[in-house]
Structures are given as C-alpha cells and as structure tokens.
Amino acid sequence: MKKYLLLFISIIAILSCSNRENTESKNIVIGAIMGNMADTFIKYIHDDLLEYSKSKENITILIKDASGDAGIEQNLVENLILQGVDGIMLQLVNPETSRAIDDLAKQSNIPILYFNHRPKGLEEGAYSYVGLNERRVGELQAEAALKVRNSGNAVILIGPLGTEAAEDRTKGVKDKIVNSGIKILREQSASWYRDRALTIVENWITSGLNIDFVFSNNDDMAIGAIQGLEASGKVMGTNKGEIMVFGVDATPDGMNLINDGKMYATIKQDTMVQASEALDAMIDLINNGTNIIKYLDAEVIISSKYK
C-alpha cells in the first residue's frame, strides 16, 4: 500500500507542477483538517472558515476532523493528497508529527499551511503558518493579574502536553511573574477540556491548596475551574480571599462568565480573523508558492465588574 501511495504521490506531483500556472483561473480545492472539533474554539474556527469561504469564488473547501488523533490526521492528509487537492490547511493534533506530514506534502508538491498550532522540527522559512504568538498570550494573562495583585498562590491549567499553544502560553505566564510575589503551586494538563479541569481543581481544593490565581490555557478549562471552585464554596473576584481566574479565546461561554464577573479576564483570539487570514494565506500560497508566516494580534478582555 505504501508503494502505491508513493507512486500516486509522484503522479500528483507531476500534474501539480504542470497545472500550477493555471490555479488562478480554475476552481481551487482546499483540504482543511481540524485537529479536534470537540474543542469548542476549533469548532468556532470551523464554522467561520465555512462562512468566510462562501465569499470566495472558485474555492471548494473539504473540511475534515482528526478527532484529536495524530494517526487519523496523517491518514486524512494522505487521503487529501490522493484526491489531488490544490492545498492543505492543517491544525496539528501533535506538532511532533510535523516532519512526516510535511514530507508527504512536499513529495506530492501540494502546499501545506499550518494554522493555530505551529509545527515543530521544521526549519524557519520552510513552512507557512498563521496564528498567534502564543507566549505573548500567557504574558498578557500575567500582566493583567499583576496590575491587581503582586503576590499570591497560582495554579496553571495546561492544554495538551507537547502542543506549542499549551507550552508557550504557560511559559508566558511564568516569564512574567518570575520576579513577582506570585508563586505557582501546581500545574496540570486538562487537555483543553472543562470537565477534566473541574476535577483537577476540585482535587486541588480538597487537598487543602490555597489558591489566589487560576491561569488557564483556554476558556473551557477556565470554565471547568470556576465550576470546581464554586462547588467547593469558593468565590471569584479581586477581594481578599477571592480567586482570580484567567482564560483564553473569548468564547461565548467564556464571555458569559466575564460578564458575570466570575472570570476576571480572557485573551481574545478572533476565530473569524484566524479563519479568514488562514484561508487567504492558503490561496496565496497555492497561487504564488511563497511561504508565509503571520502572527495575529491578541486582546485582553477584563470583566467590566472590575474596571
């Protein structure tokens, strides 16, 4: 099977080279693979990508869901190559698989654009990416906290281990608070899920941990943390004895808690901006063949109850 796949990739590469000059006038078919649409934020990107693609003429989007499985994701890439798509947009499940996937795409001469999760192990300038500066996201959380309190006990809820978003958002928080009086007592991965975050936080409280700050790598885990804290009789806020909770994404559910004052702040990364910028970059990459790196802006949203 592997031999036939490589043969087919060679044929696709030849055809792709001969047709590249005509991509601007023909219908362009783009495969878009979402890492896991059970992730609320990724589902919003999916919806916005579909909506934005309607404004583009001669563009067909084939959206696939890897369901959080790196093996499934690689199979989806292979299937899209066999279908002869003009380009692949990829939100990586595991950035450690970047090399194998990138090699497949290069062998077929099909351009690939990574979005939301940056690849690992690829040379700078040798790939295309659209997404946030993830370390800056964590820094923004910490900066917002330090404007209110310069000391206290913190915990961090981390996304899937090994992903750039989880690692760099966590590093961003740590880098900013290193010279402050804020001490990190615990950090644990809840893999973006609110139910796992709820259980983790309840266990921390049950163990007697005294928490002043919860830094969460995304809104869903922050929501789970708030649910766990409330179930344990804790109060969210900025007064003495109250807990400040920070999220990322500004999802509708997260914004509801911002408006209620239960989440102190979230970092907004606009899903429509990510979807539209990624699709535009993919089309440009198909037509021009020049690698693109674009970092998108993030914005701190603080609950109006604390302004």
Where are these regions (language model features)?
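Extracytoplasmic "Venus flytrap"
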Residues: 29-48, 52, 56, 62-75, ...
